[in-house]
């Protein structure tokens, strides 16, 4: 079994390293630094290539049995489309803003199985929702999730576990919720509230546009929301930058040069938010599902708390996200899920065997979702 992993960032490297224990894996990236990290620590094959050149994919991917799409979000949709056009099965973790289900007909036509949003949230949150949706009548679904540094450094008290550009996109995109059966659009970062967690103390939750596919696949659930978790105070800093125009996309003239404020801000925040090797962090997620089963009220909660792995020097967000992606990839590899088309995880969770497989795959790697 030959697997191609497109993208060798923090999560992409974790995906390639884990899969290489059982399969012949090749990692593709245009950044030689990322590839060098893999070369030094694994036996993963590494090839430098510009993955925005989709015209080369047919030749590039012809010998591979499965593709993992781990490129940054801004190039994810077109990359997935190119992979599907090559007729290759794919697990996608690029978290692009476009609607992946728009590619369903193409995937069916090309006889491709494509599982998208294969991470933590979206990803595992969707899988869990899909599983319980098959067992009970759900009235409300709430997901709170965040990846944070253990060491709090002012002013932002934050390190980006993935591309800072994707974080800024998350902070600026309006949030879609479902309230009383209707989709409601709220400003990003709105409705902040403080919540206490056993492992980390008080965190602040904020609206973000994380429901994604379940807005369309779970329309029968009357109340659904997803919120991002940060240390208290972080949100007010971001809101101040936003209100002052630092995230504006229209060009302004500075000393005779036209620049976009968001580009300058991104460059500055990239350095501020860059996680250094060895920086300890954690991932936390809480899922609350309320409804009825056999006409009896039922509440279900899941809690994920995972920390940086000191032994393997693997960030928690890379572990929780990358291993989830690999669990879904193995569903395809082992033919446990072989339907053709584009499928977000909630459409896979309704199969109990698939649900158990993914949960056990993660548990075997020390990532455990505790149910109460």
Predicted regions and their residues:
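Conserved acidic E/D residue at the C-terminus of a beta-strand in Rossmann-like folds
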Residues: 27-30
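Conserved N-terminal Rossmann-fold NAD(P)-binding element of oxidoreductases
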Residues: 3-7
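ADP-ribose/adenylate-binding Rossmann-like module
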Residues: 82-100
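Helix N-cap at the beta1-alpha1 junction of Rossmann-like dinucleotide-binding domains, i.e.
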Residues: 32-34, 97
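C-terminal catalytic/substrate-binding lobe primarily of soluble NAD(P)-dependent oxidoreductases
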Residues: 134-372
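Conserved Rossmann-fold cofactor-binding substructure of NAD(P)-dependent oxidoreductases
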Residues: 51-63
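N-terminal Rossmann-fold NAD(P) dinucleotide-binding loop
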Residues: 12-13
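Rossmann-fold NAD(P)-binding glycine/threonine-rich loop
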Residues: 94-114
């Amino acid at each position: 079994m030959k697997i191609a992993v497109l993208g060798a960032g923090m999560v992409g490297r974790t995906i390639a390293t884990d899969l290489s224990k059982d399969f012949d894996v090749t990692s593709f990236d245009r950044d030689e630094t990322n590839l060098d990290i893999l070369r030094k620590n694994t036996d993963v094959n590494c090839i430098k290539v510009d993955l925005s050149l989709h015209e080369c994919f047919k030749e590039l991917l012809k010998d591979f049995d499965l593709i993992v799409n781990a490129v940054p979000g801004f190039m994810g949709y077109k990359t997935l489309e190119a992979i599907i056009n090559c007729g290759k099965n794919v697990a996608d973790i690029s978290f692009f803003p476009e609607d992946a289900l728009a590619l369903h007909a193409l995937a069916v036509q090309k006889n491709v199985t494509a599982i998208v949003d294969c991470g933590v949230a979206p990803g595992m949150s969707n899988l869990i929702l899909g599983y319980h949706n098959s067992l009970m009548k759900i009235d409300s679904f709430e997901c709170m999730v965040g990846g944070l540094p253990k060491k709090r450094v002012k002013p932002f008290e934050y390190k980006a576990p993935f591309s800072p550009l994707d974080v800024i996109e998350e902070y600026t995109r309006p949030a879609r919720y479902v309230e009383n059966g209707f989709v409601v659009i709220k400003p990003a970062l709105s409705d902040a509230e403080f919540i206490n967690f056993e492992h980390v103390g008080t965190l602040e939750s904020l609206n973000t546009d994380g429901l994604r596919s379940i807005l369309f696949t779970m329309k029968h659930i009357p109340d659904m929301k997803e919120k991002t978790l940060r240390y208290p105070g972080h949100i007010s800093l971001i809101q101040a930058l936003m209100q002052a125009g630092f995230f504006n996309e229209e060009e302004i003239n500075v000393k005779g040069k036209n620049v976009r404020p968001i580009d300058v801000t991104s460059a500055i925040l990239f350095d501020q938010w860059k996680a250094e090797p060895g920086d300890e962090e954690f991932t936390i997620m809480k899922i609350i599902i309320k409804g009825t089963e056999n006409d009896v009220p039922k509440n279900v909660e899941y809690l994920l708390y995972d920390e940086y792995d000191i032994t393997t020097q693997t960030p928690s967000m890379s572990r929780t996200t990358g291993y989830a992606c690999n669990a879904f990839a193995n569903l395809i590899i082992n033919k446990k899920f072989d339907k053709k088309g584009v499928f977000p995880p909630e459409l896979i969770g309704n199969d109990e065997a698939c649900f158990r497989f993914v949960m056990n795959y993660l548990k075997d790697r020390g990532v455990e979702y505790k149910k109460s």
